[in-house]
Amino acid sequence: MNQSQRKTLSGLVAQLDTIKDAINDMATEEQDKYDNLSEGLQQSDNGQKFEVNASTLNDAVSELESVINNLGEVE
């Protein structure tokens, strides 16, 4: 990989990291919404949606971390 390609890859990794951070913030917000509900409301459809959304977003963050780590191994 030449210098220009490494620079491009570095920029892409930085963009992915920014996206990962934004998704992580969204996951935290969804989890906070769920946590701030009473126990009864946590069991409601909306409460369950908050919990599922947080979990799905956290899964996406984990996948992006894996992609970022893999790209970091490219020489």
Model-identified regions with their sequence ranges:
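Long, low-complexity or tandemly repetitive, helically biased scaffold regions used
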Residues: 1-75
